[in-house]
Amino acid sequence: MLAIGSSIPNWIVARDSSIAPKYPPVGLQVYTLGFLLNAPGADTRSILKQIADIGIKEIETATGGNGLYYGQKPKVFAEMAKDTGLKWIGNHIGGLPRTPAASATSTAARPRSRNLRDNIQEIVDDAAEGGCSWVICSSSAISTLDEIKRTAEVFVKAGDLAEQNNMRFAYHNHQSEFDQIEGVTAFDYVLTNTDKKKVFMELDLAWATAAGQDPVALFKKYPGRFPLWHVKDLDKTTGRPCPVGTGKVDFKHIFTNSKLSGVEHTFIEQDGAKNIDDPASSVQWLKNNIYK
């Protein structure tokens, strides 16, 4: 793991070596296979082994809202991952909660999942117990300028606490982070109103592309702020997530300029994947076309 505040990933430092990898190891956001991991009676260890068998080295999760990680305490889940040859890098959790719509069946009366505003200490404690190096916000309320400002405040606290526990904090984008709200975007506001050594972005390459953004232009605008990537593709016709290399995202252009971003970990993600063959084909395409 890098020292806190360092902007040069280990794989870049070692690039002169004949055995150094050109890019970070291929990882997977296991939300891609949530239909397996969240199924009743799921064999978590067996599923993690299947993930390792397709060539994945690192994983990111999207769970823990109730303190369990696919039914396991963080230490147990981390041990399962390690036993199958996987390294657990971090977990997605919500940021500033959205205000639920008022109705007779409003979800407001239900227990709220843990989030960074209300449960940051427990979330960081879980990440530390699991040996994670990152705490990641999956999404946050950003529909108004006030929400954007409050989201940034939550992220400042998350970045501080993560650093105090030898971890780092990142925010994962969707398309809405690039919407103009009272003359600003949540994406720009967060990056210009937080400490660049404590608050980073996990850039979802597909959703940034769908929002009309060039990821490389973002790297140039905010160099070193993108140590985490979601490597996701979008179907050229439907705009829905599809296996990497079969859609419209220009991965060769992006990876060629990866050093600008400060990338350390890349995670394949495919919302709506039908089976493990989908991420397996993404791994193979990356190995044949990017990691060759």
What is the role of each PLM region?
Residues 2-129, 133, 163, 284, ...:
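N-terminal pre-domain/capping segments
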Residues 3-7, 18, 98-200, 276:
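Active-site acidic/histidine proton-transfer and metal-coordination neighborhood
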Residues 4-11, 15-27, 35-52, 131, ...:
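Histidine-acidic metal/acid-base catalytic patches
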Residues 24-30, 59-61, 88-93, 135-137, ...:
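Hydrophobic faces of well-ordered beta-strands that scaffold small-molecule active sites
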Residues 31, 56, 92, 169-174, ...:
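Aromatic side chains
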Residues 34-41, 62-73, 95-101, 111-117, ...:
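Acidic-and-aromatic substrate-binding clefts and catalytic sites of carbohydrate-active enzymes
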Residues 69-70, 74-76, 81, 134, ...:
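Non-transmembrane, interaction-prone segments in cytosolic or luminal domains
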